[in-house]
UniProtKB/Swiss-Prot annotation, chains A, B:
It is found in: Cell membrane. The modification N-acetylalanine is found at A2. Residues 39-69, 128-156 are extracellular. It comes from Arabidopsis thaliana. This is CASP-like protein 1B1. It comes from the Eukaryota. It is a multi-pass membrane protein.
Amino acid sequence: MAVSKLTLAATSGKSCKILLGLRLLAFSATLSAAIVMGLNKETKTFIVGKVGNTPIQATFTAKFDHTPAFVFFVVANAMVSFHNLLMIALQIFGGKMEFTGFRLLSVAILDMLNVTLISAAANAAAFMAEVGKNGNKHARWDKICDRFATYCDHGAGALIAAFAGVILMLIISAASISRLVQPNKCCSTTASPSVVP
Amino acid sequence: MAVSKLTLAATSGKSCKILLGLRLLAFSATLSAAIVMGLNKETKTFIVGKVGNTPIQATFTAKFDHTPAFVFFVVANAMVSFHNLLMIALQIFGGKMEFTGFRLLSVAILDMLNVTLISAAANAAAFMAEVGKNGNKHARWDKICDRFATYCDHGAGALIAAFAGVILMLIISAASISRLVQPNKCCSTTASPSVVP
């Protein structure tokens, strides 16, 4: 009897570490997405005309906050990073507090809300980036990535990080929902995994 | 003892009906969003130039599949409608099958995946519609809703239905996650709510 409980404690300790690892990965993915997109800016000078033989130059800047979908992207990734940071702190330092049904339930619902948010932001930005890359001939919207290549490359990097965050958050959300069915007590890493009597 | 179990059966019967009602609402919201956007098309003729005094006319058509975000919107709303239809059928006709932990867990995870999908599609389409309505002066993308007002109105209607679907799916997902903590047996409406012994 004691042996099976020992194995339960061992596996639940291991699954908590995996969940903690996933949260750390998700935190770094969404935080880097928010930072890379938030700092994404490129300034370029183009020749826009000629007066006689003298070319007329104009300077243009591409910045993330020129596109509402990218502003939403930065805000949402920052919020989800904060959520994961909170959950990580809860798991590491919240060891003494009992992981009761209600606590697990709120973590599961919060995770679901955050995966909904990050998936909305990543997809809105992705479809907007697609228009920036390919344009839309029906709406006569020209592509911009032929003139602002660095800006688009950085944007693509932020999108990849954000979609990695979406996948990680889907796994984390499914895991925290599953924990409700077998509520193994996610012991904190500081407290030694107590053998369940 | 029997009285408290009777009240449990009564409340669980009621909560199942509410969940069923929410699913029916979500189903109609996402289905109408998919249909309205899928059929969204407007053809107009504009004067695009003059040769001498004779105006040159050209006919333009705005269709949902001219925009990848709207194609994603129609597909995602159709998928979430199908998911809800399946869950409704399961709840109505699946009465005899025991709602065990695993069944409730898979319903909760499926609901989470579907709210993630519908939120991605609704937000991607919303930000694209915003560009259609207001244009983007930085990218020099002109708005199109001044010329295709009906097309944009129908698109707005589909978006409102889809966001209603997102809110309903958030509530449904939270409810199906909460059911894992108090797994009241969601009895089917056909079988009379059996009194839990």
